[in-house]
C-alpha cells in the first residue's frame, strides 16, 4: 500500500476512535460538578472575521435549601463553526482544568473539520488554510494542528497546489518571476511544483510564451518596443527577455508585406 494511502487509513482510524470516545463521554452518567452550556446567540468579535459563540462552564450550587442556581465558573469564546463539535462531545467535567484540556482537543477537531470544508470547494495551500482558520477565531495552536493533520491525510498538498498553480498560470501567459512571487505569498517555491511543472518554465518555454503574449497584443502606435516590453515585464517575464521579444515583434510588424 502506498505511503499516502497508509496515512489516509490512519486518519480514518483516528476519526473512528474519536467518535467512539465522544459517544462514551456523552453517555457517561457519572456525577460531575460542572456542565457545559453553549449560548444560542452568535456575535462578532474583532479582530476575528467569523462569528463567535460563548461556551460556559456551569456549576449547580445549592441556594435556599434544595433549589439550585447555575453559576458560570469558566467561559470560553469559540468560533461558531466549532459549536457542533462541542455540542456533540462531553457535557460534564470535574473541574476547569478538565474542561480546558477537553476544549483544546475539541478545537483541534473543529478546526480540522473546518479546514476540510474550506478545501471542498477548491485546492488551497497549507499557509492559506492556516490563515483562514486563525482569522475565523481558532487558536493558532489548534489551527496548526489541523493543517498538519490535513497534510498527513492528503487533504492538503502544497506540492499538488504548486503544480496546479504553475500549470494554470503558464497557460495564462504569466512569466516565471511573477509565478514565483505569487507562490512565495503562500510560503511556497517553484521547487515545490516538481520537475514536470518546472519543465514548462525553461528559457525556451518562457520565450515561446512571451512571444505568444506579445503577438496577441495590439501594436501601440507610439513607442511600441518600450510599451510591449513593459507589458511583458508586468506579466513576470525577465527584463532581457521582454526587450528581446518586444524588438522582434515590432520588427516583424514593420516588415513590408509581400503585396
Each model region followed by its residue ranges:
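An alpha-helical, amphipathic repeat domain used for nucleic-acid recognition
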Residues: 1-259
Amino acid at each position: 500500500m502506498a505511503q499516502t494511502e497508509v496515512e489516509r487509513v490512519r486518519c480514518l482510524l483516528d476519526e473512528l476512535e474519536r467518535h467512539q470516545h465522544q459517544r462514551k463521554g456523552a453517555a457517561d452518567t457519572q456525577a460531575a460538578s460542572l456542565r457545559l452550556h453553549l449560548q444560542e446567540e452568535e456575535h462578532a468579535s474583532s479582530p476575528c472575521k467569523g462569528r463567535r459563540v460563548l461556551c460556559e462552564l456551569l456549576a449547580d450550587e445549592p441556594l435556599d435549601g434544595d433549589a439550585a442556581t447555575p453559576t458560570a465558573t469558566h467561559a470560553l469564546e469559540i468560533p461558531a463553526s466549532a459549536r457542533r463539535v462541542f455540542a456533540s462531545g462531553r457535557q460534564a467535567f470535574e473541574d476547569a482544568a478538565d474542561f480546558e484540556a477537553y476544549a483544546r482537543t475539541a478545537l483541534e477537531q473543529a478546526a480540522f473539520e473546518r479546514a476540510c470544508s474550506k478545501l471542498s470547494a477548491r485546492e488551497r495551500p497549507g499557509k492559506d488554510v492556516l490563515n483562514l482558520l486563525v482569522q475565523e477565531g481558532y487558536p493558532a495552536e489548534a489551527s496548526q494542528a489541523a493543517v498538519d493533520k490535513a497534510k498527513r491525510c492528503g487533504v492538503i498538498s502544497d506540492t499538488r497546489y504548486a503544480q496546479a498553480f504553475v500549470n494554470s498560470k503558464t497557460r495564462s501567459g504569466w512569466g516565471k518571476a511573477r509565478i514565483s512571487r505569487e507562490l512565495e505569498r503562500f510560503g511556497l517555491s517553484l521547487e515545490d511544483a516538481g520537475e514536470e511543472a518546472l519543465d514548462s518554465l525553461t528559457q525556451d518555454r518562457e520565450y515561446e510564451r512571451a512571444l505568444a503574449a506579445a503577438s496577441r497584443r495590439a501594436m501601440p502606435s507610439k513607442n511600441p518596443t518600450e510599451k510591449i516590453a513593459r507589458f511583458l515585464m508586468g506579466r513576470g517575464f525577465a527584463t532581457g527577455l521582454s526587450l528581446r521579444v518586444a524588438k522582434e515583434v515590432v520588427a516583424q510588424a514593420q516588415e513590408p508585406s509581400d503585396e
